[in-house]
Amino acid sequence: MSLLGLPKVEVIPSNAAEDLPKTLQPFEYVLATATKKAHAVYEAEIQTEEEKGEPGLIIAADTVVVDTSTGTILEKPRSEASHIAMLKALRSARNHKVYTAIAVMAPLVSARQPGYAMETAIEETAVRFDGGVSDELILAYVKTREGADKAGGYGLQGLGSILIQGIDGSYDNVVGLPLKTTLGLMEKVLAKADDDDRLGDDDMGFDDEEEEEEDDE
C-alpha cells in the first residue's frame, strides 16, 4: 500500500466468517466475501469511534484460485497433504484463474444513509502452471511453507515462480492487491465523499423549506 502513497496504513483483521458456499460462481464468491470483510471492519471501527476517531478509508479484498478444468474454488491449503494435492491438481489442469475482489469504503460527512460510500471491482488473471514440474519439486516447495498461507498454495513473487509457465493479465493480482484497480476505486470513493460534503444541507432541502415558511408569513 505504500506504493499508493498512503501516509498511514493500519492492518485490521476482519472477523467476518469466510463461510459462503463454494457453489457460488467465483466472481460472486470473492465479491461477497470482500464486501463482507469491509462491512465487518467498518462496523468494528464505528464501535471504537470515540477512542480512535472516525474510520478512514477502508480497503478489503479476497482472492481465490479457480481450477478451470473442474470449476473448483481453491483457497489456502488446510494442511501439508491438502497443499500437495492442490498443487498437483493445478499441474494436471495446467490452466487456472486468479480472482481478486476489492471493496473500498469511506464514511460520508452527512448523516445520509447508509453513512458510507462504497465501490467494488473484480480483477481476473489467467495463469498457466508448468506441466513438467515433478512430484519431488512440488513436495520440496510445500516444505518451504511459502505458499501455505496463499490462495492456490503458491507465491508467484517468490520460489513459487518455478511452478508457473506464464500469466495473462495483472501480475499484481496474482501476488497481492491489484494496484491500478484499487487506486481507481479509492479515487471514486473519495470523490463520492467529497460530493456529499459539498452538497451539505442545501441539497437536503432545509433552506428551501425555510424560504417557503418565510414566504407564507
Model-based region annotation:
Residues M1-V11, V189-K192:
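N-terminal G-site helix/loop of the GST-like fold
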Residues P13-K22:
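Short, acidic/turn-prone active-site loops that include or flank metal/cofactor-
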Residues Q25-E217:
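Anionic-ligand binding patches
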